């Protein structure tokens, strides 16, 4: 029973880390990265779909993204979606592909991005702690039902805490790595 609770909590914690990595991947760090466009949705014949499912996205140069749509008539729609996004990029449409030049980050922009990264990391840590609390509450509920002894509850809570500490350490490393990437000139 405790093992199931701990396993479930660990899976939720890993999902939180995966979401954090994906969110940080969409933040521009002065270098072109196709994952920056992951959140962009386009109107594909009446239904919204991710840009990556309607076009090939590549990075031929360190600061350039090239978007080649599967169908040429999507160029205008892709351009519109990029302009509406919060990325602050200006697409250049040449009739068959769209180029996005990623501007150099100013010192102020870098500092703002680092703040965003720290905030996102802190939100992930709060989510992890919430998962820990839920797992501990479930373990304590088993004790109230008479299914567990005090020692089993203590061991279960210790195991949950160890998993929590390991995941928070991973999150801290991810945040530090992203900060270094942003601040690298």
Curated annotation (Swiss-Prot):
Transmembrane segments: none annotated. Belongs to the RRF family. Its main location: cytoplasm. It is found in: Cytoplasm. One of its GO terms (biological process) is translational termination. This is Ribosome-recycling factor. It comes from the Bacteria. Pfam families: RRF. Keywords: Cytoplasm, Protein biosynthesis. One of its GO terms (molecular function) is ribosomal large subunit binding. The keyword Heme does not apply. Responsible for the release of ribosomes from messenger RNA at the termination of protein biosynthesis. May increase the efficiency of translation by recycling ribosomes from one round of translation to another. InterPro entries: Ribosome_recyc_fac, Ribosome_recyc_fac_dom, RRF_sf. One of its GO terms (cellular component) is cytoplasm.
């Amino acid at each position: 029973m405790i093992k199931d609770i701990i396993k479930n909590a660990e899976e939720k914690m890993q999902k939180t880390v995966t979401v954090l990595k994906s969110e940080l991947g969409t933040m521009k760090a002065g270098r072109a990265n196709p994952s920056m466009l992951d959140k962009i949705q386009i109107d594909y014949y009446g239904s919204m779909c991710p840009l990556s499912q309607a076009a090939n996205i590549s990075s031929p140069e360190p600061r350039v993204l090239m978007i080649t749509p599967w169908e040429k008539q999507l160029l205008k729609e892709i351009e519109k979606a990029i302009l509406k996004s919060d990325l602050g990029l200006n697409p250049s449409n040449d009739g068959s592909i769209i180029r996005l030049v990623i501007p150099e980050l100013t010192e102020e922009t870098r500092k703002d991005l680092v703040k965003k990264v720290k905030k996102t990391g802190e939100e992930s840590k709060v989510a992890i702690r919430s998962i820990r609390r839920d797992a501990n509450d479930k373990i304590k509920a088993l004790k109230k039902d008479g299914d567990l002894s005090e020692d089993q509850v203590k061991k279960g809570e210790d195991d949950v805490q160890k998993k929590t500490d390991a995941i928070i350490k991973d999150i801290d490393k991810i945040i530090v790595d992203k900060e270094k990437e942003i601040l690298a000139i």
